[in-house]
Amino acid sequence: MMATSQDYFGNPYALFRGPPTTLRPRESPLGVGHPHGHGHLHSHAHAHGHGHAHSHYAALDLQTPHKRNIETDVRAPPPPLPPPPLPLPPASPRYNTDQGAMDQQFCLRWNNHPTNLTGVLTSLLQREALCDVTLACEGETVKAHQTILSACSPYFETIFLQNQHPHPIIYLKDVRYSEMRSLLDFMYKGEVNVGQSSLPMFLKTAESLQVRGLTDNNNLNYRSDCDKLRDSAASSPTGRGPSNYTGGLGGAGGVADAMRESRDSLRSRCERDLRDELTQRSSSSMSERSSAAAAAAAAAAAVAAAGGNVNAAAVALGLTTPTGGERSPSVGSASAAAAAAAVAAAVAAAANRSASADGCSDRGSERGTLERTDSRDDLLQLDYSNKDNNNSNSSSTGGNNNNNNNNNNNSSSNNNNSSSNRERNNSGERERERERERERDRDRELSTTPVEQLSSSKRRRKNSSSNCDNSLSSSHQDRHYPQDSQANFKSSPVPKTGGSTSESEDAGGRHDSPLSMTTSVHLGGGGGNVGAASALSGLSQSLSIKQELMDAQQQQQHREHHVALPPDYLPSAALKLHAEDMSTLLTQHALQAADARDEHNDAKQLQLDQTDNIDGRVKCFNIKHDRHPDRELDRNHREHDDDPGVIEEVVVDHVREMEAGNEHDPEEMKEAAYHATPPKYRRAVVYAPPHPDEEAASGSGSDIYVDGGYNCEYKCKELNMRAIRCSRQQHMMSHYSPHHPHHRSLIDCPAEAAYSPPVANNQAYLASNGAVQQLDLSTYHGHANHQLHQHPPSATHPSHSQSSPHYPSASGAGAGAGSVSVSIAGSASGSATSAPASVATSAVSPQPSSSSTGSTSSAAAVAAAAAAAANRRDHNIDYSTLFVQLSGTLPTLYRCVSCNKIVSNRWHHANIHRPQSHECPVCGQKFTRRDNMKAHCKIKHADIKDRFFSHYVHM
């Protein structure tokens, strides 16, 4: 990334200056490492309010950007650098200000810099290029880069600083080679996939190596540095570190040199951490931001300790009270009341962070901006380090008379007046910079958010099932970034079973990991380990959550194998079903379609009537014509739904049987067998009393079945009303003009056509509740298609050939004996998921017999009924015999009994097992569902008018 600042332009040789040779106080700090390393610097960041230079900071001048040179100065003096060609003018601060005001600055940002940097570093690691360290463990060696290891682990940084060697070899004891490879992947890429079994050891190794992002190492690292600085400051001759600086090198020259060098190294480290935090800000989630901001506060405290403000650093880090010398990480304030206030503030911060993800994002960006601005000020003014961390919201309000600044940048009454003055001077600038930062954050999010994260919520829901929820708080983050330095534990697809969520599961975002939670609480000034009560054991908690998920999955699988189903629902044998068997199960759905578990995933399906009877045994025997051998085909149709070959065979056998005559009367036998066999599903159906002459002709009253179902009263009323309507229709039609005898059988019993299984000629084999009303109208308006009965064209009655505007149909004329008549019953219901209308074909024998024409007339009636029933078939499926619901899953999942696949959309999966029954009338392509076929026609054959598809032929 490239960036410019007025300090850089005002002093072009600032980057090449050597160590200072004079002790004159600086009027204004120059750009310390800021012109490089992060994507944007604003020229007004340090322009005002820094003129209050204190005398004991006179010798501190960090112009060189090379951290390694600064840190190695402890060991060896730096090589002499050539002096700048032109000396600086004495009025350089004023010159800088004027130059910056006159010259317009341009901010050049590299949007995908973190991604590019990560990719290049990973490539270098894989190619072992430019490596300068070798790690040896378990007899294997792996090469890496000291810079990357030092940036990701203070442990390695200490090793490399203490052992100055161009290519050291580090032997790691008790570290597995695979773990070291995974740790390197995490350091270079920012993420790594680790198996559940090896996760505890991996995290333990990361903790021992102090890998940032996997352990709470920032607090420990800076605390140890502050301890060393405190000890060295306490061992100075005067007992006060700042006095050495105030008095020059005095009588303690060696101590002052050592202090200055250590302070320089600390300062450069803080700069680097802040630069890293600024660089990764665009690709970090909110959980990272909170922990990084807390680390920035710790860095500020460390710098304060380096400057000699030991009390300020101790209070900020929760190390010790100003008077007591013993370490107390739990209570870092001056009094117990202050500690309690800090803990309460930390808990409130956690609650606020989990309250709203959107609000948290905006507030987090504001806090991070304020924090970064303050941290830059801290780096340049070492006495200003007593400000608390904005993100943790814990203010040490105890009786520290040294430093007591508020989160709102208003300083309370204290003795450090210079800090409050600078705070007031910079408040206006911070407000302006905060506005600019907010706008840049928005732009950066729009420019760096990958396309995958902007996809639909459906994909996010699909992906969310593979993300294990490790959040100890209930905060879902709305911003989805590809990088996440906090350990983002991923597992194989395990359904989410626990954890309260503030948003829906579709958010699918990254969560606050317990590690970031403990980091922010530990680093929240004042209330270190006490505040960690909300995240008692971050690592073990996350592992226990994963263990609970795995246990829940095992229990769920155990329950799946021991689901108690009613005997009627259990298919025979080993559930090895073919397409025909699946279609058999699919057709057995009408009377059990009310599954209490359907409403979760199938809300988009139509809530249809449960009395859609495809294979139900509810019949009426009001008419003598009903006693027909066609009832024998009930079972055959249940076995061979949608199978044209089988249907044709049944038709031929049936016609052959009818032509053979009735040597033995099969009607009574079949009816007796029917009454002797208890029906599979009983419904209480009470029909209206039939017409007197029909009652005399039929010789049997209404059959009343006792219902064992759940919705008996409602269904009985509904069926009774429909039966009464059918009876009235029959009564009206009985007074019509005389018909052919088989017309009588067609017209007199629309109830049977609707409620009994259709005859063999109906290939689609469909019936529904909606078909009753439609059949009534179609019968009344002459949709029975009398030409199917081999009448001459003049024999059709005009009163029955008129068409209804609501139920149009095309009629095919049978042109003589031996021809095949086709009845096209159009469905004009306009449903998006309508199944095809059926075509009833009958092989007519050359000698027209009454039996064949009788079956043909019944087939015509069923064809009219099927026109409406076709709309309901695709959506009215009984899933209880096809799927087993898995308990304890969110979203609700189901296991298919045929293929054992676990799905969430049962309707879609059930259609996969159905035969390809819908054929495009234009190109002949077959589809499982009619709506898919219609969509195909509208796209592929758009030149054909849409009205064609409401009258197309079911091939």
From Swiss-Prot:
Disruption phenotype: Mutant males exhibit bisexual behavior; they court females but are behaviorally sterile so fail to mate and they exhibit vigorous courtship with other fru mutant males.
Biased composition (Basic and acidic residues): 258-279, 360-379, 421-446
Gene Ontology molecular-function annotations: DNA binding; DNA-binding transcription factor activity; zinc ion binding
Keyword Transcription annotated: yes
Ranges for region Disordered: 1-55, 70-89, 229-288, 352-526, 784-814
InterPro entries noted in UniProt: BTB/POZ_dom, Dros_DevTransReg, SKP1/BTB/POZ_sf, Znf_C2H2_sf, Znf_C2H2_type
Comp. bias intervals (Pro residues): 76-89
Keyword terms of this UniProt record: Developmental protein, DNA-binding, Metal-binding, Nucleus, Transcription, Transcription regulation, Zinc, Zinc-finger
Subcellular location: Nucleus
Name recorded for this polypeptide: Sex determination protein fruitless
Stretches with biased composition (Low complexity): 387-420, 464-475, 790-814
Record's function text: Probably acts as a transcriptional regulator. Part of the somatic sex determination hierarchy; sex determination genes transformer (tra) and transformer-2 (tra-2) switch fru splicing from the male-specific pattern to the female-specific pattern through activation of the female-specific fru 5'-splice site. Vital for the development of males and females. Controls the development of the male specific abdominal muscle of Lawrence. Plays a role in male courtship behavior and sexual orientation. Enhances male-specific expression of takeout in brain-associated fat body.
Matches recorded under CDD domains: BTB_POZ_BAB-like
GO cellular component: nucleus
Zinc finger (C2H2-type) residue numbers: 918-941
Source organism, top-level taxon: Eukaryota
Location of the BTB domain: 131-196
Residue spans of biased composition, Basic residues class: 35-55
Polar residues bias (residue ranges): 233-246
Entry comment describing in which tissues the protein is expressed: Expressed in parts of the adult male brain associated with the courtship song and steps of the male courtship. Also expressed in the larval and pupal male mushroom body and optic lobe. Expressed in pupal female optic lobe.
